[in-house]
Every structure is written in structure tokens, then in C-alpha cells.
């Protein structure tokens, strides 16, 4: 057994539609509970009691004065809807701004227009204008609220620039090595120039010794000039060990042990001259340095 409850929907009346009754089905007591009674009379009384209870509940719910919760919700909803409709219909400018603000805050689609009780979407031109206006407002608000971009340090060279950086480092190392080699060459050149100056000085000495006999100065030949390297420590060795002075006539030989009975030293024939020896060494050193570098 079922009890049918009829409720009218008043919300659709504000939209111009005819209200249609809504039917809710309420179930009575289950049959197995009714069959569980001990006697047919008790079962009949149970059925009648269940029916009476269902009728009382349905009549209580159908009375609007007792259903305070549902009635209050309906009233609040209808009042709010009526106020919103009056507000939107009285101010077209505020309608557009309010719709735009609501769309920005909630992210919903623009509101629908009701024509003849049916919802119709807005025109394409109006929707484009609203979208453009929303975009302008968003960009202006973003430019005001956004702080200036933070400055980050420049990133280092990436993997693609690693080869270029290695080439630059290798070229710098080559330049440094070339600089060191240039400094070494400059040092060698300065040493060679110094040796050349000494060689020129020795050549001038030789020229002076060749011109000395013509001017009347004493002259000793290179072959007969005594040499301290061939005396081998005899008694009659010279006190001065510089044979070059004796060769050039700048010094006279003196006896190391003077006296009456002192015998003159035995002169040994020279096989080479100290001056020739030093000059030849300088020439060989200069030639060897040039060949080396």
C-alpha cells in the first residue's frame, strides 16, 4: 500500500510557467510486519493503524502552516530572486558591470537573457565586447599589482659554450708561452751583444800590439814570449803570472829570488799565446751560441 503526496512547485510560477503538481510516493508499513501479528484481528488493526499513521503524516506535511522550514526557504528564495530581477531590469549599465564582475569572480559564463520564458544566449557581438573589456580590465589590474621583475644573475656558459671557452683558454696559454720565449730570446740577444763588444775590444788590443814596434816600443814575438804555464815551478819563474802584459810590452819580467849569484831564468819557447787563446775562445763561444739559437 502506498500513499501519494501532492506538492505544487511555486518556483516556476515566477518564470511564467504553469505550475504542475509534483507527486511523492510514501510507502506504508511492510507486509511482513503486518503478517507478523498473532491474529487476523490484530493484523487488521495493524493495517488500519498503519494507514491512519500514514494519513496523519501526509496531512501534516501537506499543511503549509506546519512546514516552517520549507515555507521559509521558499519565501527567502522568491524574495531574493525578485529583488535581483528588479535590480537588473532597472539599471542596464549596472547589469553589464555586474555581469562582468560576476563572470570575473566566479569564472562562469555570461548571464543568459530570458525572452518569452526561455533562456537565450547573448549575441556574438555583445559577448566579444565583454571579453575585450574583461581583457583590458585584467591587463590594467595586472600592471598595477604586479611588482617589477626580480633581477637574477646572468647564467654561466652552457654546454654549447664549453668548447669555445676551452679554445679561449688554450689560446691564452699559447700567448703566455710565446711571451716567455720572447723574453728568453731577448736575454740571449743581450748576452750575444755583450760578447760581441768584448770581442771588438780584444781586436783593438791586437791592432795596438801590431802598431807598437813602429812607434819604438819594445816588442816580443808571440813564439818567444815566456809563458808561466811552461815554467813548471822552476826557481827562475816570474813573479807576475800575467803573460799577456809581457807579450804586449807593458811589463818586464822580474826574478822571484834576487841576488848576486842568481842565474837568469831559462826561457822556454811558447807554443801558443794567452791572447790568442782567449780570443779564439770568445770566437768559438760566439759561433757556438749562434749555431745553437
UniProtKB/Swiss-Prot annotation:
Biased composition (Low complexity): 116-125
One Pfam family this sequence matches: Spc29
GO biological process, one term: spindle pole body duplication
Keywords from the named record: Cytoplasm, Cytoskeleton, Nucleus
Segments for region (Disordered): 87-165, 212-238, 254-276
InterPro entries recorded: Spc29
Compositional bias annotation for Pro residues: 146-158
Family: Belongs to the SPC29 family.
Protein name: Spindle pole component 29
Species per Swiss-Prot/TrEMBL record: Eremothecium gossypii (strain ATCC 10895 / CBS 109.51 / FGSC 9923 / NRRL Y-1056) (Yeast)
Gene name per UniProt: SPC29
Amino acid at each position: 500500500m502506498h500513499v501519494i503526496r501532492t506538492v505544487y512547485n511555486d518556483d516556476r510560477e515566477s518564470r511564467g510557467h504553469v505550475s504542475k503538481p509534483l507527486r511523492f510516493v510514501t510507502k506504508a508499513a511492510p507486509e511482513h510486519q503486518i503478517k507478523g501479528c498473532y491474529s487476523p484481528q490484530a493484523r487488521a488493526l495493524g493495517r488500519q493503524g498503519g494507514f491512519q499513521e500514514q494519513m496523519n503524516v501526509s496531512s501534516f506535511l501537506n499543511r503549509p502552516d506546519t512546514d516552517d522550514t520549507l515555507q521559509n526557504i521558499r519565501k527567502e528564495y522568491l524574495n531574493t530572486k525578485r529583488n535581483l530581477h528588479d535590480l537588473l531590469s532597472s539599471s542596464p549599465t549596472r547589469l553589464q558591470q555586474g555581469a562582468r564582475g560576476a563572470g570575473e569572480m566566479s569564472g562562469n559564463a555570461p548571464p543568459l537573457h530570458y525572452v518569452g520564458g526561455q533562456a537565450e544566449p547573448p549575441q556574438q557581438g555583445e559577448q566579444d565586447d565583454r571579453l575585450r573589456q574583461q581583457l583590458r580590465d585584467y591587463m590594467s589590474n595586472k600592471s598595477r599589482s604586479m611588482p617589477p621583475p626580480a633581477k637574477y644573475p646572468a647564467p654561466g656558459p652552457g654546454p654549447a659554450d664549453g668548447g669555445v671557452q676551452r679554445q679561449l683558454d688554450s689560446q691564452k696559454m699559447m700567448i703566455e708561452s710565446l711571451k716567455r720565449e720572447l723574453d728568453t730570446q731577448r736575454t740571449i740577444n743581450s748576452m750575444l751583444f755583450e760578447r760581441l763588444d768584448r770581442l771588438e775590444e780584444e781586436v783593438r788590443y791586437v791592432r795596438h800590439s801590431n802598431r807598437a814596434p813602429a812607434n819604438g816600443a819594445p816588442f816580443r814575438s808571440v813564439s818567444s814570449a815566456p809563458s808561466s804555464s811552461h815554467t813548471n815551478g822552476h826557481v827562475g819563474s816570474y813573479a807576475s803570472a800575467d803573460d799577456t802584459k809581457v807579450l804586449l810590452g807593458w811589463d818586464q819580467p822580474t826574478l822571484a829570488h834576487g841576488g848576486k849569484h842568481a842565474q837568469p831564468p831559462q826561457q822556454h819557447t811558447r807554443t801558443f799565446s794567452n791572447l790568442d787563446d782567449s780570443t779564439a775562445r770568445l770566437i768559438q763561444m760566439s759561433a757556438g751560441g749562434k749555431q745553437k739559437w
